[in-house]
Amino acid sequence: MGGISIWQLLIVAVIVVLLFGTKKLGSIGSDLGASIKGFKKAMSDDDAKQDKTSQDADFTAKSIADKQGEAKKEDAKSQDKEQV
């Protein structure tokens, strides 16, 4: 009563084929499949890239600000040594 029967689905499918044609439906299906494949590939590439960067090196990454801070500390130490 409330559900869609197999016959109603077949009638809808026949109407869709008559409206769009088999060539158009085939191209839509292949385009949809290609886009899904590209999406899955992009998702797996992101995961692989993230794993590679997180396990790439044994040392901790330092930012430019950290390097500049260390350089200032070394300059201050060398100036202190010169003053003594």
Swiss-Prot record:
Membrane spanning stretches: 1-21
Record key words, sorted: Cell inner membrane, Cell membrane, Membrane, Protein transport, Translocation, Transmembrane, Transmembrane helix, Transport
GO terms of molecular function: protein transmembrane transporter activity
Name the record gives this protein: Sec-independent protein translocase protein TatA
NCBIfam families reported for this sequence: PRK03554.1 (NF002922), tatAE (TIGR01411)
Topology relative to the membrane: Single-pass membrane protein
Organism superkingdom: Bacteria
Subcellular location: Cell inner membrane
Subunit-level organization: The Tat system comprises two distinct complexes: a TatABC complex, containing multiple copies of TatA, TatB and TatC subunits, and a separate TatA complex, containing only TatA subunits. Substrates initially bind to the TatABC complex, which probably triggers association of the separate TatA complex to form the active translocon.
Primary localization: membrane
Chain spans, region Disordered: 42-84
UniProt feature, compositional bias: Basic and acidic residues: 42-55, 64-84
Similarity-based family: Belongs to the TatA/E family.
Cited function: Part of the twin-arginine translocation (Tat) system that transports large folded proteins containing a characteristic twin-arginine motif in their signal peptide across membranes. TatA could form the protein-conducting channel of the Tat system.
Gene Ontology CC: TAT protein transport complex
